[in-house]
């Protein structure tokens, strides 16, 4: 409560009898209000409570500072004297107040309580009004601040929503970017891992291939080592073979062979009923093939002993040519007819000429029956020949003889072929002149008397065809040929004669051509051999008549069947009117062949 209001209340509530006692207090406090009159003080306390409060504030402060109850009591006691002093003074505005004014006219002590109550009520009303205004202002300010706060909050919410939306958009963009980047990185990593796996697999395959190739290389090295060892062994064997061939004594071998074949075979006159049937024959064959050219072959066989009791051939005589003689004496010794042992079987078979063999072989051919020369005739077997008897044996012998005679008459003056180690020579005899055709160069014709002498020798030998030899320049070995075309005439038979052997004109110092490891003898040796063979052929021709009357026809028939079988083993292509030589070393790709 304000200080002035309290003073007034105290002043109004104090009875009147106590005014004298308190006058001293008023005097004590008179200095405090000496600057203002009482009316001004009261007026200010009624209409300007703030001023009264400001004025009373120092007093209230001083009272509180003193903290003494005595001073307060003294101050309260001096209040009624002030009120009474105010009542005695004139009004400020001078005049009656119709409305009663703020203060009514001075009243008595009994009515002063009502006035104070009114004053308090008015004071309360003014205070309430001021408080209400203050409160209203405060509420309005609060409301305005709330509105402002609400607007600011709404603005902040809008801003926050926009910011949050932008943040969300940016976060979504960042998430998408991160997802795409991670997917790309995953793809790259997967491709890298896959490439690495493929590379490792390829490396493993390459390692496997390398190991396989390494194994193959090792195997190849081992094979090469084996081949080197094999080559060394073969070279050693070749050296040993060369040493053995170098140690071979050809003259001693020839002497031993001569000693073995010089002794004639012992024949039992009691068991031998017919002379030897094997003779020196020029066997001819003829096979007509439309797609091939005729090839000439010639076989030479010497008398061989026939044992009718055993049904097989005994060792007979064959023309054996010695090997590599260095002088004429050894050649003459080797040129003598030799008796060789024949294989003890029932068949006399021809040896097939091998074109790819380095060592030349003279084919031995047997006689051919009438079925080979007469069209439509079949070769009989052994059982058929045995069943037919001795009558058919005679017809076979006649056909065989007539075939030889016709061949002799047709090819009496045929050309002779001989070969030089350097070139092939073809000698044609015609009208007393000799023409030689070679591979690289030509030779001058021989003298006419040599050709004439050859014809005389052929006539002396009863028109037996000349055996021609064809030499291979590659291996320096001759090949015998056979004149083939036949035209049989029944009832004719002439003795057989051995062929004429020719000497190579290109080798005057060493007139030797190896045949089966042997040599071709000079003229003296040829003459001796021819005389020997002529005697043998005459002996054989005298005994031919015994074939038909022999009681051992079956054995003889089997012998001829053996000859026929041997002849039929190697069929030849022939054409009448042509005489060609077959070179053992001939090849279809060789331009040097005829």
UniProtKB/Swiss-Prot annotation:
Subunit and partners: Part of the MCD recombinosome complex, at least composed of IHO1, REC114 and MEI4. Interacts with REC114. Interacts with MEI4. Interacts with HORMAD1. Interacts with ANKRD31.
Gene name, per UniProt, is IHO1
User: Which residues does this entry mark as bearing Phosphoserine?
Assistant: 588-589
Q: What is this protein called?
A: Interactor of HORMAD1 protein 1
Q: Does the keyword Coiled coil apply?
A: yes
Lineage of producing organism: Eukaryota, Metazoa, Chordata, Craniata, Vertebrata
Question: Where is this chain's protein located in or outside the cell?
Answer: Chromosome
- A single cellular component GO annotation: condensed nuclear chromosome
Region of interest (Disordered), residue spans: 434-454
- The principal localisation class reads nucleus
Alphabetically list the UniProt keywords.
Chromosome, Coiled coil, Differentiation, DNA recombination, Meiosis, Oogenesis, Phosphoprotein, Spermatogenesis
Report the record's Gene Ontology biological process terms. Answer: DNA recombination; homologous chromosome pairing at meiosis; meiotic DNA double-strand break formation; oogenesis; regulation of homologous chromosome segregation; spermatogenesis
Annotated Pfam families: IHO1 (PF15771)
Q: What does this protein do?
A: Required for DNA double-strand breaks (DSBs) formation in unsynapsed regions during meiotic recombination. Probably acts by forming a complex with MEI4 and REC114, which activates DSBs formation in unsynapsed regions, an essential step to ensure completion of synapsis. Not required for HORMAD1 functions in pairing-independent synaptonemal complex formation, ATR recruitment to unsynapsed axes, meiotic silencing of unsynapsed chromatin (MSUC) or meiotic surveillance.
Instruction: Please list the coiled coil stretches.
Output: 109-135, 165-189, 219-245
Q: Where is the composition biased (Basic residues)?
A: 444-454
Cystines in this chain: none
- List the biased-composition ranges (Basic and acidic residues): 434-443
């Amino acid at each position: 409560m304000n200080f002035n209001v309290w003073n007034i209340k105290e002043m109004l509530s104090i009875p009147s009898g106590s005014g004298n006692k308190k006058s001293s207090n008023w005097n004590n406090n008179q200095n405090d209000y000496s600057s203002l009159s009482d009316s001004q003080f009261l007026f200010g306390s009624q209409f300007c409570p703030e001023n009264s409060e400001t004025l009373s504030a120092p007093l209230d402060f001083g009272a509180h500072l003193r903290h003494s109850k005595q001073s307060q009591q003294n101050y309260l006691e001096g209040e009624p004297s002030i009120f009474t002093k105010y009542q005695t003074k004139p009004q400020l505005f001078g005049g009656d107040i119709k409305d009663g004014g703020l203060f009514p006219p001075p009243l008595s002590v009994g009515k002063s309580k009502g006035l104070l109550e009114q004053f308090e009520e008015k004071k309360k009303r003014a205070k309430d009004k001021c408080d209400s205004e203050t409160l209203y202002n405060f509420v309005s300010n609060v409301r305005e601040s709330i509105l402002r706060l609400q607007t600011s909050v709404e603005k902040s919410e809008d801003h926050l929503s926009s910011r949050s939306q932008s943040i969300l958009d940016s976060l979504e963009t960042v998430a998408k970017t991160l997802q795409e980047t991670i997917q790309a990185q995953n793809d790259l990593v997967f491709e890298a891992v896959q490439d690495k796996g493929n590379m490792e697999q390829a490396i493993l395959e390459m390692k496997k291939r390398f190991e396989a190739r390494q194994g193959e290389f090792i195997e190849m090295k081992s094979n090469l080592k084996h081949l080197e060892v094999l080559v060394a062994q073969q070279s050693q064997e070749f050296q040993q073979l060369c040493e053995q061939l170098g140690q071979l004594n050809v003259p001693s071998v020839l002497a031993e062979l001569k000693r073995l074949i010089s002794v004639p075979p012992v024949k039992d006159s009691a068991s031998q009923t017919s002379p030897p049937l094997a003779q020196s024959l020029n066997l001819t064959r003829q096979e007509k093939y439309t797609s091939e050219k005729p090839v000439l072959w010639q076989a030479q066989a010497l008398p061989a002993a026939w044992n009718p009791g055993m049904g097989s051939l005994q060792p007979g005589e064959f023309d054996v040519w010695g090997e590599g003689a260095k002088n004429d004496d050894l050649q003459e010794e080797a040129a003598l007819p030799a008796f060789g042992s024949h294989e003890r079987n029932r068949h006399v078979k021809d040896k097939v000429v091998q074109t790819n063999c380095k060592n030349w072989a003279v084919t031995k051919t047997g006689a051919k029956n009438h079925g080979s020369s007469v069209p439509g005739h079949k070769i009989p077997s052994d059982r058929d020949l045995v069943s037919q008897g001795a009558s058919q044996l005679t017809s076979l012998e006649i056909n065989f003889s007539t075939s030889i005679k016709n061949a002799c008459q047709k090819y009496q003056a045929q050309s002779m072929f001989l070969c030089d180690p350097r070139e092939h020579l073809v000698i044609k005899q015609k009208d007393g002149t000799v023409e030689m055709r070679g591979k690289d160069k030509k030779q001058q014709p021989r003298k006419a008397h040599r050709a004439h002498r050859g014809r005389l020798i052929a006539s002396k030998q009863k028109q037996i065809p000349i055996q021609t030899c064809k030499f291979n320049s590659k291996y320096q070995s001759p090949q015998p040929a056979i004149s083939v075309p036949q035209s049989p005439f029944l009832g004719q038979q002439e003795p057989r004669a051995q062929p004429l052997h020719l000497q190579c004109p290109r080798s005057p110092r060493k007139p030797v051509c190896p045949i089966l490891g042997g040599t071709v003898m000079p003229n003296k040796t040829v003459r001796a051999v021819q005389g020997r063979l002529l005697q043998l052929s005459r002996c054989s021709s005298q005994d031919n008549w015994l074939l038909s009357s022999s009681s051992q026809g079956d054995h003889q028939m089997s012998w001829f069947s053996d000859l026929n079988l041997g002849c039929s083993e190697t069929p030849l292509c022939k054409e009448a009117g042509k005489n060609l030589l077959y070179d053992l070393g001939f090849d279809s790709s060789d331009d040097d062949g005829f």
